[in-house]
Design a protein with these regions (language model features):
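Structural core segment of the AMP-binding/adenylate-forming
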Residues: 2-23, 130-203
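Conserved AMP-binding/adenylation subdomain of ANL enzymes
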Residues: 249-270, 277-343
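Conserved pre-ATP/AMP-binding loop-to-beta segment of ANL
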Residues: 66-69, 190, 196-230, 237, ...
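Conserved AMP-binding A3 loop
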Residues: 82-87, 217-219, 226-253
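Conserved AMP-binding/adenylate-forming core of the ANL superfamily
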Residues: 46, 67, 71-123, 143-153, ...
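Conserved structural elements of the adenylate-forming
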Residues: 90-96, 206-212, 222, 241-263
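Gly/Ser/Thr-rich phosphate-binding loop
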Residues: 293-295, 313, 322-325, 335-406, ...
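Conserved ATP-binding/catalytic segment of the ANL
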Residues: 427-487, 620
């Protein structure tokens, strides 16, 4: 038995062990069932307090505790932490704001940020907020990976920046050249001062703020556009989504409406953040949440992919977070690491109050392993929360209570209304509320298509109540309306619910799975093996290669899975093991760590063809 098997077995007793208290109110909702079959769901908890703007929030926190560390980042090569305090952040933001105002920038302009998370990136963002100039953080892959810069050009055409910032002039030189061709009047700013014609960020930081900065800050309100975030672009060119201070404030207020206890002013929450600020989770919810809570965030240069997650583990030896949020794939890798390393386990659980995930469903197996580890270290289970939303909506539902159930999307955040609309055999999710954008920037056609006749935004996902007779138990993610497919028999396959169940059934040997079978006679699966599992099989002295051993193991586990599947919509006919890790460059896994089913199937079409070949192609196993 491997250590992972042991952890999962130990977790059988986990339901008898109490959860660590969650500092949030319990579920309380009103459900309205309409004559047309649609269902409206609202929280009975009122929203709490929220800031006027993030610029005002920064000023208030800097005045309250100017010397408290706000953000820390390691020097290159996993060196010592460097930091900026709340007071230093305010002074820097006001200097940058003054520099932008001196250059004539207004709310009709924008500043584009090309590079990944850094202290300098954060200061530029705060400077833009303070000046009332929208900031547009772009996925670094658009500049560094793309050969034609098509998405970079597109994003620039949408927001028409006047200033472009990047951490390194040399690293982003090619992107600068591309953008210069689009607009010869662009001003380039770099943190390292490098780059032909680029202005060092230090020049902006050294600008002395005048009364103009305070005047600009006082014009800010809930209607002010703070930034533009772009959708992932997995099904076309990214769409620019205006993010107002009102949307951000409503998200904070929703969380405050669920707070069950007053924050301890003597406790400074510590967090570790790897997810990119070019997306809603880290860029708005996480970034603003740290400011609101007066916490200290440590920037993590690791990612939940082989070869990079080791950096996250190194950081977790030193940073013991109060809350840890990430993509489901990261929790699987973290469980593997902690099962082998009691020192890491002790550091991770030292201050932890709860964990959170989003963007995909966490498997029951990973949850059980995490809880077994928590019990071994703390004697308690750790609540696992989820928040569900999109670039266009912020977080609109949350699981804010301790529950045995994995896969919930929770219940509406205070102030938000969820509408469930019948769509075939499922309910499509739509949302309205102060956290939702008014539309796409400079794209009225897509804006009109995104909202229904009542003004609800169409999320494109499906959800259902865990218990129709007791909606307070929460809603369950029921797949992407556009991701599900039909077999050639006409039977629907729900990818969003099948995938995590498959991963759990094949634990601890697989990291993730991709499902195929549209218009085919049976479902196929493509698996990524877990690193720990392959290491265990490589150390086994028995006959066969690790891949052959894994194929045999998965064949047995899938045969057992099929016996309880209940029908062709969940039975696996054939599978193949992918020996090449998911590629960020090719879009198979996003910079948030979420697997893109469509991109993976397109890139690995040869493997899909092998699954359905007669006879099966190389490497394909029949269950």
């Amino acid at each position: 038995m491997t250590s992972a098997d042991g952890a999962a077995s130990a977790a059988v007793s986990a339901p008898k062990v109490p959860f660590k208290p969650l500092p949030q109110k319990g579920p309380d909702v009103t459900v309205e069932r309409r004559a047309d079959g649609s269902i409206l769901v609202r929280s009975n908890h009122a929203p709490g307090e929220g800031p006027r703007s993030i610029a005002h929030l920064l000023r208030d926190k800097a005045l309250a505790h100017p010397d408290r560390p706000w953000m820390k980042q390691r020097e290159p090569g996993h060196g010592p932490w460097r930091q900026v305090t709340y007071g230093e952040a305010l002074r820097a933001a006001e200097g940058i704001a003054q520099s932008l105002l001196d250059r004539g920038l207004t709310g009709a302009d924008s500043v584009m940020v090309l590079s990944s998370n850094s202290i300098e990136h954060a200061l530029v963002m705060l400077g833009c907020y303070t000046a009332g100039v929208p900031v547009a953080p772009i996925s670094p892959a658009y500049s560094l990976i793309s050969s034609d810069h098509a998405k970079l050009r597109h994003c620039a055409a949408v927001v028409r920046p006047k200033v472009v910032f990047a951490q390194s002039g040399a690293m982003f030189e090619r992107a600068f050249q591309t953008l210069s061709e689009v607009d010869t009047g662009l001003v380039f700013v770099t943190a390292d001062g490098e780059g032909e014609g680029a202005i060092p960020l230090s020049d902006l930081l050294a600008t002395a703020p005048t009364a103009a900065v305070e005047a600009a800050r006082e014009t800010l309100g809930h209607e002010t556009v703070a930034k533009y975030l772009f959708t992932s672009g997995s099904t076309g060119m990214p769409k620019g989504v205006p993010q107002t201070f009102g949307m951000m404030s409503a998200t904070i207020a929703g969380g405050e409406g669920l707070r069950a206890e007053e924050a301890d002013p003597d406790v400074v929450p510590q967090s570790l953040e790897w997810m990119p600020w070019s997306h809603i989770s880290a860029g708005n919810i996480g970034f603003n949440g740290v400011l609101w809570g007066g916490g200290t965030v440590h920037l993590d240069e690791g990612k939940p992919i082989p070869g990079m997650f080791e950096t996250t583990i190194k950081n977790l030896y030193e940073v013991s977070p109060m809350v840890f949020g990430s993509a489901p794939i990261a929790f699987g890798m973290l469980a593997e690491a902690m099962e082998r390393d009691p020192v890491l386990r002790a550091s991770f659980f030292k201050n932890l109050r709860y964990m959170g995930y989003g963007g995909a469903t966490l498997s029951n197996d990973v949850n059980e392993r995490l809880q077994a580890l928590a019990i071994a270290e703390t004697g308690q289970r750790i609540p696992l929360t989820t928040m569900y939303g999109a670039t266009e909506t912020q977080g609109v539902t949350v699981t804010h209570w301790a529950t045995e159930q994995v896969g919930l999307v929770g219940l509406p955040v205070p102030g938000v209304t969820i509408k469930l609309v019948p769509n075939g055999t499922k309910y499509e999710v739509r949302v309205k509320g102060p956290t939702v954008t008014t539309g796409y920037h400079n794209d009225p056609e897509k804006t009109a298509a995104a909202f229904d006749e009542e003004g609800f935004y169409r999320l494109g996902d499906a959800a259902r109540f865990l218990n129709d007779n007791d909606p307070a138990q929460g809603m369950v993610f029921d797949g992407r309306v556009t991701e599900d497919f039909k077999l050639d028999s006409g039977t629907w396959v729900s990818v969003g619910t099948l995938r995590p169940d498959l991963v759990a059934a094949c634990s601890p040997w697989v990291m993730d799975a991709v499902i195929c079978g549209q218009d085919k006679p049976f479902i196929g699966a493509l698996f990524w093996p877990s690193m720990a599992g392959m290491q265990t099989l490589a150390a086994d002295a028995g006959p066969g290669t690790p891949l052959e051993k894994l194929t045999a193991l998965l064949s047995g586990k899938l045969a057992a899975f099929n016996t309880t599947a209940g029908g062709s919509s969940r039975r696996i006919g054939r599978f193949v093991i992918m020996t090449e890790p998911p590629s960020i460059d090719a879009g198979e896994i996003t910079d948030k760590g979420y697997v893109n089913q469509r991109a993976t199937l397109e890139r690995r079409d040869g493997l899909v063809q092998n699954i359905y070949a007669n006879p099966p192609g190389a490497g394909v196993a029949t269950v």
